[in-house]
């Protein structure tokens, strides 16, 4: 169920983890007839404005966009933003190939932030570091893989255990 009000705009659900982090989840199973997400598709769905708004609304806010479709280099850019020591190091060492540079420039445009302004650059990196563009495969192979992992932890019929775990997660909101 999508949360009501301003906080629920552009998200399927919100969770708070044990560390007090508030996680906003947007899930999209498809992108019309496209087999991946282009930056323009995400812009069309207002993902950049919504993620920025949620992340900037307070400390410990994270935005997750989850889909079985690929994102190009966007998820890699966000991972790199989480592993830098300074804004200048990020530009020098993490934005180091043409594809990543192009995606970074698109993010700069879509988030309406300017890398030449040191405070806006820090804000852009902060937003990217708090965004997760997760690729989640669906299908029979993934189900078998998940049940294989379950079999290494639990004893019993793995499909039954998977169903019980899914039911528990849905009933308690523990994701």
Q: Language model features by range: what are they?
A:
Residues 1-49:
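Catalytic centers of nucleases
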Residues 28-175:
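Acidic metal-coordinating catalytic centers involved in nucleic-acid phosphodiester chemistry
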């Amino acid at each position: 169920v999508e949360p009501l009000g301003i906080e629920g705009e552009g998200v399927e659900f919100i969770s708070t983890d044990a560390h007090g982090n508030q996680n906003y989840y947007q899930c999209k199973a498809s992108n019309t007839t496209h087999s991946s997400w282009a930056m323009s598709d995400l812009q069309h769905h207002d993902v950049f404005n919504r993620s920025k708004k949620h992340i900037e609304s307070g400390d410990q806010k994270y935005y997750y966009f989850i889909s079985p479709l690929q994102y190009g280099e966007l998820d890699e850019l966000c991972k790199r933003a989480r592993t830098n020591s300074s804004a200048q190091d990020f530009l020098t060492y993490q934005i180091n190939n043409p594809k990543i540079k192009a995606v970074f420039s698109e993010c700069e445009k879509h988030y309406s932030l300017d890398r030449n302004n040191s405070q806006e650059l820090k804000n852009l990196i902060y937003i990217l570091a708090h965004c997760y563009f997760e690729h989640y495969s669906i299908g029979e192979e993934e189900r078998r893989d998940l049940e294989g992992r379950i079999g290494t932890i639990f004893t019993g019929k793995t499909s039954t255990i998977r169903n019980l775990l899914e039911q528990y997660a849905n009933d308690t909101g523990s994701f």
